[in-house]
């Protein structure tokens, strides 16, 4: 049967299927933190606070902005004329701008214990100016997650936007975290906290997990029969 997201029990099966501590830790952090794969792979040893039980996530995002070639005013994709200087814009100038954001996330004791064991075994790797927890490329991380899901006997997941089934990927573990959180509590306050935890700029992005989890439809359906419950 086609599924849209993973259950915590299925992710636990992936961890059990891991032969190496590194791979088990990768799956654990992707799910328990609900982070982007780039954030987990960019995790530094100094970002971990074992005493407070938190991890500081650095999110570096490069955004491409379009600008007028004459006055450098910002343009939208559909702009044919510059709103500032009025010239006809045949080819806008592309400018890459980096945005760096930080957020501090709580970590459960089991994940912290796994992290400590991994670091005690010398798992971290030193790079110029920093000590990374993982020495993995995005592609290699994707391969590890895919292979562990297959080894655990998990099905492919259906992507809602396309309706097509795909192998389990790191982002599906992030999705699983969000859906799990929404299924436990989908109140307004909980969704706001989830938005902050996930690093979503817009609450609309967070709200999509209510639809994926089925909670939104369940509430709607239950509301259709409220009168009958009172009559009974």
Where are these regions (language model features)?
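Short, leucine-enriched amphipathic alpha-helices that occur as contiguous helical runs
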Residues: 11, 22-24, 138, 142, ...
């Amino acid at each position: 049967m086609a599924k849209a997201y993973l259950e915590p029990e299925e992710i636990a099966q992936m961890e059990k299927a891991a032969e190496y501590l590194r791979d088990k830790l990768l799956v654990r952090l992707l799910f328990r933190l609900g982070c982007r794969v780039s954030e987990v792979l960019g995790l530094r040893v100094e970002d971990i606070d074992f005493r407070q039980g938190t991890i500081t996530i650095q999110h570096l995002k490069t955004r491409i902005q379009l600008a007028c070639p004459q006055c450098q005013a910002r343009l939208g994709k559909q702009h044919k004329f510059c709103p500032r200087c009025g010239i006809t814009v045949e080819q806008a100038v592309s400018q890459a701008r980096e945005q760096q954001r930080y957020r501090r996330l709580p970590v459960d004791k089991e994940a912290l214990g796994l992290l400590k064991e991994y670091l005690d075994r010398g798992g971290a790797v030193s790079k110029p100016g920093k000590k990374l927890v993982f020495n993995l490329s995005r592609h290699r991380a994707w391969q590890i997650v895919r292979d562990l899901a297959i080894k655990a006997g998990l099905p492919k997941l259906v992507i809602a936007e396309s309706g097509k089934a795909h192998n389990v990927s790191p982002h599906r573990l992030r999705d699983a975290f969000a859906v799990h959180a929404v299924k436990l509590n989908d109140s307004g306050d909980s969704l706001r906290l989830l938005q902050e935890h996930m690093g979503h700029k817009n609450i609309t992005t967070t709200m999509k997990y209510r639809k994926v989890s089925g909670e939104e439809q369940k509430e709607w359906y239950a509301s259709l029969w409220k009168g009958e419950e009172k009559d009974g």
